[in-house]
A protein has these predicted regions:
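Short, solvent-exposed amphipathic alpha-helical segments in soluble enzyme
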Residues: 18-23, 49-51, 100-111, 168-173, ...
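Active-site diphosphate/adenylate-binding microenvironment
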Residues: 230-292
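Active-site glycine- and acidic-residue-rich loops that bind
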Residues: 13-15, 92-99, 160, 251-255
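Conformationally flexible catalytic loops at phosphate/diphosphate-handling active centers
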Residues: 19, 23-82
């Protein structure tokens, strides 16, 4: 848990609940725990108890945002100025900060291929020009190609956990520089394996990238971006061909076709939740094919 406390004074219940709520949703969101002893739980307290002696804002406020240290930010920007083949892997921190549109704008303006971590919420629509699929080198060959050919990988709002091979090869080859940008110190601590780290709200970092681009300090050749789109197109065509070939002369329903049919029936307000074994395996492939 991010925060745990035992309430020893019933008049302070609103204070503890308010603090726990804000801690749970700030920085790197996570669970909190409050214990209320039985004697307090079954007691009564005035609704306005504690308002005068411990005043605090009770309404919900926007979570505090981390702004990057100028020197640390400059090191990341200098790294990108030298890069020819960057990739960006976006994680749940982008979702929590509500900066998906800024993420997409960065991809459009700077021509950076964008991959989504292979779990948590989807950040960009499948139809987005800059979205290249999930960052999964085992099930999605285009992401493997991108990471093997890249010279810089930016992970924004994500963790170097088991799905990212803890920042090690073969997921992140030794040939590239890995930079992690996170909005809270505790999450940044998970990414100690990165070559470079930056404490920054994702939106603040995206803003800095756009400003650097506007000043023509960061400019990337579109050939790298186009090659990643080409790799995705070739992979989708191959998967469709393989599924159709396996289905020929068989009365059985191919699991990939099932996954694609489920997606085809979904609308913009529908949610797709997947987990477990073959269901996850084939549905993840279908997700990477969607929107092409």
């Amino acid at each position: 848990t991010k925060y745990s406390a035992s309430i020893s004074d019933g008049e302070r219940i609103p204070e503890f609940v308010d603090r726990a709520f804000k801690i749970a949703l700030s920085g790197y969101p996570g669970p909190v725990h409050l214990s209320i002893p039985v004697d307090i739980m079954f007691s009564s307290f005035d609704e306005s108890a504690g308002l005068n002696e411990r005043p605090f804002v009770r309404r919900q406020k926007h979570a505090a945002r981390s702004w990057p240290c100028p020197e640390d930010l400059k090191r990341i920007l200098d790294l990108l100025m030298q890069s020819k083949r960057p990739v960006l892997i976006a994680g749940h921190g982008v979702w929590w900060s509500g900066t998906e549109k800024q993420l997409e704008a960065v991809g459009h303006k700077l021509k950076i291929p964008i991959f989504n971590i292979p779990y948590h919420q989807k950040l960009l629509g499948e139809e987005s020009e800059v979205y290249m699929g999930l960052a999964d080198i085992h099930q999605y060959a285009p992401s493997k190609y991108a990471l093997q050919q890249a010279d810089v990988a930016l992970m924004v709002g994500g963790r170097l956990d088991n799905q990212m091979n803890f920042g090690n090869p073969p997921f992140f080859p030794d040939s590239l520089q890995l930079a992690c940008i996170n909005g809270s110190p505790e999450e940044l601590e998970y990414n100690r394996a990165a070559d470079h780290t930056l404490l920054s709200d994702p939106g603040a970092f995206f803003q800095a990238l756009m400003e650097a681009h506007a000043e023509r300090e960061i400019l990337f050749d579109s050939n790298w971006f186009d090659e990643n789109k080409n790799q995705r197109g070739l992979w989708v065509a191959q998967m469709q061909h393989d599924a159709e070939k396996e289905a020929e002369g068989s009365s059985k329903l191919h699991p990939l076709k099932l996954a694609l049919d489920v997606q085809a029936a979904m609308g913009p307000d529908d949610w797709l939740v997947i987990d477990g074994g073959n269901t996850h395996f084939w549905t993840e492939i279908a997700i990477n094919m969607a929107g092409w």
